Amino acid sequence: MSKTRVYELAQQMGIDNKELMARLADAGVSVKNHMAVLEDSDIKALSAPAQTPHKEVSQEEVRVKPTLIRRRAKAVEPEAAAAEAAPAPAAQEEAPLKAEPEKVEPEKAEAPKPRQAAEPVRARIIEAAPVPKPAAAPAEAAKPEKEKPAEPAPAPKAAEAPAAPAAEAAPAPAPAPTEAPAAKPEAPAPTAPAAPVAAAPAEAQAPAKVEEPEPEKATPTRARILGRVEIPIPAQRPAERREYQRTAPGERPAPRPGMPRGVERPGTERPAPRPGGPRPAGAPGRPGERPTTGRPGGPAGGRPDRPAPLAPIDAPPLLGDDRRKGRKPAPAGGTDYAKNGKKGAPAAAGKGKKETFKDILDKRERVFEPGPRSKGKKGKYEKVQIGKKTEITVPKAIKRIIKISESITVGELAKRMGIKATDLIRALMKLGVMATINHPLDFDTATLLATDFGYEIENVALDVDEILEAEPDAPESLLKRPPVVTIMGHVDHGKTSLLDAIREANVIAGEAGGITQHIGAYDVELNGKKITFLDTPGHEAFTAMRARGAKVTDIVILVVAADDGVMPQTREAVNHSKAAGVPIIVAINKIDKPDASPGKVKQELMEFGLVSEEWGGETIFVEVSAKKRINLESLLEMVLLQADVLELRANPEKAARGTVVEAKLDKGRGPVATILVQEGTLKSGDYFVAGVHYGRVRAMQNDRGEKVLAAGPAMPVEVIGFNGVPDAGDIFVAMGDEKQAKEIANHRQMKLRESELAKHSKLSLEQLYEKIQKGEVKDLNAIVKGDVQGSVEAVAESLRKLSTDAIRLNVLHASVGAITETDVNLASASNAIILGFNVRPEVKAAALAEKEGVDVRLYNIIYDAVDDIKKAMEGLLEPTFKEKYLGRAEIREVFSVPKAGMVAGSYVTDGKIVRNAQVRLLRDNMVVYEGKLGSLRRFKDDVKEVATGYECGMSLENYNDLKVGDIFECFEMEKVAGKL
C-alpha cells in the first residue's frame, strides 16, 4: 500500500495543511501533524463519492417548551416532497405515527444509523405555534419536564439526509403534543445498524400526519419559513471505523458538519444528560440570551404561551466545509439540523454546537458570531465572511481620471492616486528628476507618472485667453465712436500746456516742477463731437507710459518745440507711434517765440519719415502756440478729419472691455483706476477683472469729477470698486458674475507667484561660486511708494537702471499709497531706505521710522530722487586709494649711530620729505625697500618735514642696508570716494 503524508496530500488538493488536518478530523481520522502518514482507507474516507441517500426520514424535534416544537426537514416545495415520498415502500407509508416511539431511541440511548452521502439538500427552520393536544403525538419529542434543561443525545448521521424530505411534506404547522412529556418513554435496547434503515420509512410519514393544521388559531399556528440554504452532506464513512467523539459528562458529543458517523456497536448506549446538568447557552428559560459558544440564536423558552424566536438564518458556519468548497457559508444551525436526525437536539438545547465550536477554535481561527436576533424582527444578520484574503480592488475607470490645473505637487498627486509619495519620487528618479514631496509637476510629467500607475491625467486648467477672447462684432452692430488722441513729445515742449489750452483748464499748475509725471485722460467736446485725450509724461523715465499710450490710442499728436527741435524723447515717441501703427499729427509748438524755427523742425523730422503735406508728404503739420492759443481749432479739426478717415467704430451693446490707463490708492475711496473703455458699455454694478485684481463697479466718474452711470466706447472714467490697485496697462474686462471674475484673478495671481518664485529659486553650485567670487558686490535695498501706479513704476525702473557691477540696487517693494508702518518694518528688517514720491508717511510710521533709524526720503520731482539714490549708492562703494608723490632725497653719506642704527645724510632734491609719510628706497631705480621713516632730523632736532634744497638725516624702520647714492622717494596714500 502506498503511503502518503498529510502535507503531500494537502499540496495535491491545493489546500493548507491545517485545513486538511481539520477535514481529516471531521472524517474521524486522527493525525498528529502534517508529517503523519495516511493510509489509503483514510484518503478514501476523506474523499468518498456521494451516494444516493436512504429514503429514511428522520424527524428531529425538540420540545423547547410545552407549546413549542422545533423541527428540521428538507426545504423543498410540498409537491416535490410528495414526489420524493412516493417511491417509499407501502409498508413504510402505512406505518402509523403512533408506532414511532418503538423505532425512535430515547434521549439516553439511540442506535446509530449508517450514514450515506447525499447531494446537498435544502432545510427549513419551522417554528410551531401552540396547538391543542393531537390524537397521536410523536413520542420522539417527548421528554420529562424535569429534563428540560438537560441536553439530548446526538442523532445518528444517517438521519440527516432523510430528515429534509419530511419538511417538504409539512409546510403547515404540525401539532405539538402537550401531555406527552408527562409519560417518560422507556429506553429500548440498542439496535443493530440495520434497524434505523428499517425504521426510516415509518418516519417518513410522520411529517405527513403532522401536516394537518388545527382549525383553532390558524394565524398563530402557522409556521414561518425563515430561510433556505444549501446543506452539503458528506459521503458515508466506512462502517468499520469508529466515530471520533469526545463526550463529557452532562453533554452530548459534538456533531460536525460533513463528518460521517460510524455505526455504534450493539449493546452500547449513549450517555444521557443528567437532569441537573449545566444549562446550555440559549436554553429554555433564557429567551434572547446569546449563546457563548453554541449556535447563535438558540431557542428561548420558559413561557408556555409564547414561542421563542428562531435562530438567525444568516449566521456564519462554524466549520469550513462549505467555505473550502467555495460556497457561501451555510446558515447557522442548518447543518446541525440535518445531521442531528430525529433526536440530535437542533441546537435548541444550547449545547448543540458548543463542542463543535470549541473544536473549531482548536483547529481554525476564531470566528465572530452575531448575537441572537431580537424578538419580533424579521431582518437577518449580515453574513460574516471568514477566511477570505484581502482583495486588491482596482478603482473604476472614471475614478482613475485625475483632474489637475496645469501643475500639481508630488504629494497631492500621490494623495489623489492613493499611493505613497515615496513611490512617485522613486518613479521620478527613474525618469532622471530629483524631486521632493512639494515639488511641482507639470502636465506632461504628471501624465507620464500617472500612466505607470494606471491613471489618466486631465488638464482642467482655466484657459483665461479663451474666456477673455474678444468676440467679433457683426458689421451692423458697429457704431461710430470718438477718437482717442495721445499727446506725446519731449519734456518741456508744452504737451500739457497745449492740452490745458484745449480743455481750458490749468492742469500743469498742479504738477510738481511743471512737468507731467503721470498719464491723464480727458474728454473734450468740440462742435458736438467728442475727442478723448491722453496726456503722457515726456521724461525719459516714463517710457513705459508712453508705450501704453501709443497702444490704446487712435491718433498721436507729436508736440515739438519750434525753438528746440527734435530731442531724444521726440525720437522715442515717433518709434512708439510707428510700432503701434498709429497715424501722427505734428504740432509745432511755441511759434510765438522769437527764435522759433518751424522749418528746422520739419527738416529734422524728415529723417524719421515724417514729411509735411506742404513738402509732398502725408504727415499733417500744424503750427500752434499753447500760450497764445494760436491755431488750436485748426489742430482739432485736423484730428476730427483724421478720425473720419479712420472710420472708428465700436459695438456699445456688448460687455465692456478696456485698458487701465492709470491707477492709484485713494485714502477715502480705496483703489481707483482710470479706465479707457474701448468697446462695449461699462455700467455701475458690473463685475470685472483687470490683471490680478477683480471687483465690482461701485461708482464711476469722468475727468471733471461728475458721476457717470454708464461709459461707452472711447470714454475715460475713474472706476471705484477694485480689490487692489491694478497695474497700468492691464486689460479691463467686464464679467458676467463675481465667481468667474474671482477665478480668473486667482489664476493670474497663482501664475504671478510661480514666476516670482522661479526668479528666487535656489542657487546652483555654479551660481553660488560666482556669488562667492563677487563677495565685494554690495546691495542697496529700497522701498518705493508713490501717488499713482505709473509714477511708482517709472521711479522703480529708474532705480534699477542705476545698478552696476560694484553695487546692486534692489527694489524690495513698490506700491501706491502713503508710507505705512508695514513699509517701515520691512525697511528696518532689510536695511532698506524708503523713497516717497508725492506721498507722505503716516504719523505712526514717521515715529516708528525715527525709532528704528530707517531713512525715509520724500520727493516730488523724479530728478531729485535719482540723484540722491546715486549718492547713496556711491557712499556704499569702498573708497579707492591713490598714491600722492611728495618728494625725493639723495643719500650723500651714511653714519652709524649707537641705538639708532644706520643714518643717511641726505639732500632733498625735489618736493619735500614728510616725517609720517611712506618712503621707498631706490637703488639703480630698483625698489629695495618700502616702508616708513624711522626718524627725520635736521641737525639735532626732529622735524616734521624738510623742503627742497635742505639737508637732513633720515633712518628707516627695521632696515639698515643704506648706501651712498641711494634715493629716498617719499609718498602718501589718500582715499578717493568711489564713483558709479
Curated annotation (Swiss-Prot):
Gene3D superfamilies: 1.10.10.2480, P-loop containing nucleotide triphosphate hydrolases, Translation factors, Translation initiation factor IF- 2, domain 3. Residues 589-592 are annotated as: G4. The keyword GTP-binding applies. Keywords: Cytoplasm, GTP-binding, Initiation factor, Nucleotide-binding, Protein biosynthesis. Residues 625-627 are annotated as: G5. Residues 514-518 are annotated as: G2. Residues 535-538 are annotated as: G3. Residues 47-382 are annotated as: Disordered. Residues 480-647 form the tr-type G domain. GO terms for molecular function: GTP binding; GTPase activity; translation initiation factor activity. GTP binds at residues 489-496, 535-539, 589-592. It is found in: Cytoplasm. Residues 78-94, 127-141, 156-171, 194-208, 280-294 have a biased composition (Low complexity). GO terms for cellular component: cytosol. InterPro entries: EF-G-like_DII (IPR053905), IF2_II (IPR044145), IF2_N (IPR006847), P-loop_NTPase (IPR027417), Small_GTP-bd (IPR005225), T_Tr_GTP-bd_dom (IPR000795), TF_IF2_bacterial-like (IPR000178), TIF_IF2 (IPR015760). Residues 489-496 are annotated as: G1. CDD domains: IF2_eIF5B (cd01887), IF2_mtIF2_II (cd03702), mtIF2_IVc (cd03692). One of the essential components for the initiation of protein synthesis. Protects formylmethionyl-tRNA from spontaneous hydrolysis and promotes its binding to the 30S ribosomal subunits. Also involved in the hydrolysis of GTP during the formation of the 70S ribosomal complex. Belongs to the TRAFAC class translation factor GTPase superfamily. Classic translation factor GTPase family. IF-2 subfamily. This is Translation initiation factor IF-2. The gene is infB.
